[in-house]
C-alpha cells in the first residue's frame, strides 16, 4: 500500500512538473498602482508619483502575470490560487536553471528593486559533492521520509552526494546567514552591478565542503550531534537556528547570534549579553526568531505583523513558510511575499583555498533576478525570522518597530529573561512538528 501511494505521488509530481515547465508565470508590476515594493527593509516606488488616469488594471499583487492565460483575480477571490505558483511549489523541484532566467527586464518592477533582489545571496540544492556518509544509527533510516528511503534504496547506499529532496531548510538558513554577513561586511547598499566580485570571501564560507565553515556538511554534522537530525533528514527552523548559532560561535568573530529557541520572546538582558559581552562594545548581532503562527496556516491576526518584519530596516528575511517546502522570503508588496527558491539543483560549489579564485560564473549561481511571490495566506505557519542589529540605535529602532506593528504582535521583547541561568525551553519543540520536504507529496503537512 505504501509503495502504491509513493508511485502515485511520483506520477502526480512528474505531471505537475511538466505543467510548470510550460506554465511558469512571472509577476508583472502594475505601473499605475504606485504601490511600494519592499526588499529587506528598503522601499521602492513602482511608478512616479504623478496623477494616474482612472484604470481598471489589476496590480501585481492582484495577480497580473506575464503571458499567462489564466484569469486575473484580486487577492481574496476564489481565483487567486490560479495566478500564483501551483500547489506544492511545483517550480521548486525542477533540475533546471531555465526557470530562473532573467525575463523581468520589461515586467515593470523598479530597476533598483531588481538590483537589490538580485544582490541577495541565494543558496540552492547542490549535486556532485563528496558523499556525506549515511548514519549508522538504527533510527536513521526510519527518520527519513518515505520518498527519501525510496530514493536511497535505488541510489548510493553509502552516502548523499546531493541534498535534493531534504536540504531546502538548510539552504534557506544558509541564505539568511549569508545575507546577514553580506550586509554586515559590505553594507546594505552593496550591489552586484557595481562590484560583483566583492562577495567572494562570503560565498567561500558556504562551499559544499567540510572545510567551509557554513557548508551543508557542517550543518549536517552539527545537526546529528546536537539536534538528533541524521544525514538525509529534513531540518526544521529550530534545528537550523541552532546550527547557525553553533557554527557562527565557532567561526565568526564579526557577527554574534542571538536565538530565541522555540519561543518568539527576545529578552533585553540576554540579547545585550550577546551583543555587548564586555558591557561596552556593541557587536553586530543576528536575531533568529523561531515561531509558529498557526496550526496548518497562518492565523489572520498575525498577517500584518509578519508582513511588517520584511519592511523593518533590520530585516534579514524569513526562512521556511511555504507549505511542503522551505523558501527564503526577502520582499513584500501588500500581502504578497517575494522569495528565493532553494529547490533548483546546481553543481556543487567547490571549496577554494583562495576565494579570489571563484569565477563570476560560480558567483552567478548564487544569485537570480527571477521573481516569484506567494500570498501571505498561503504560507506555512512555521518559520525562522532574521534581523540584523548593528548598533545601539538599530536595537532601539527595532524594539520600537516590533512593539508598534499592526495586528497581533509575533515577537515579544521583555527586559529580563526569567530562564537566564536556569536553562530554557526545549529547543527541539518546533522541530517535532516540522513540515514535510516538498519531495514528500503527501497531504499531511504537520511537521516543522
Curated annotation (Swiss-Prot):
Residues 69-78 have a biased composition (Low complexity). One of its GO terms (cellular component) is nucleus. The keyword Transport applies. It is an enzyme of class 3 (hydrolase). It catalyses: [protein]-C-terminal L-amino acid-glycyl-phosphatidylethanolamide + H2O = [protein]-C-terminal L-amino acid-glycine + a 1,2-diacyl-sn-glycero-3-phosphoethanolamine. One of its GO terms (molecular function) is protein-phosphatidylethanolamide deconjugating activity. Pfam families: Peptidase_C54. The active site is at residues 168, 341, 343. Residues 69-90 are annotated as: Disordered. One of its GO terms (biological process) is protein transport. Its EC number is 3.4.22.-. It comes from the Eukaryota. It is found in: Cytoplasm; Nucleus; Preautophagosomal structure. Keywords: Autophagy, Cytoplasm, Hydrolase, Nucleus, Protease, Protein transport, Thiol protease, Transport. Belongs to the peptidase C54 family. Cysteine protease that plays a key role in cytoplasm to vacuole transport (Cvt) and autophagy by mediating both proteolytic activation and delipidation of ATG8. Required for selective autophagic degradation of the nucleus (nucleophagy) as well as for mitophagy which contributes to regulate mitochondrial quantity and quality by eliminating the mitochondria to a basal level to fulfill cellular energy requirements and preventing excess ROS production. The protease activity is required for proteolytic activation of ATG8: cleaves the C-terminal amino acid of ATG8 to reveal a C-terminal glycine. This is Probable cysteine protease ATG4. It comes from Chaetomium globosum (strain ATCC 6205 / CBS 148.51 / DSM 1962 / NBRC 6347 / NRRL 1970). The lineage of its organism: Eukaryota, Fungi, Dikarya, Ascomycota, Pezizomycotina.
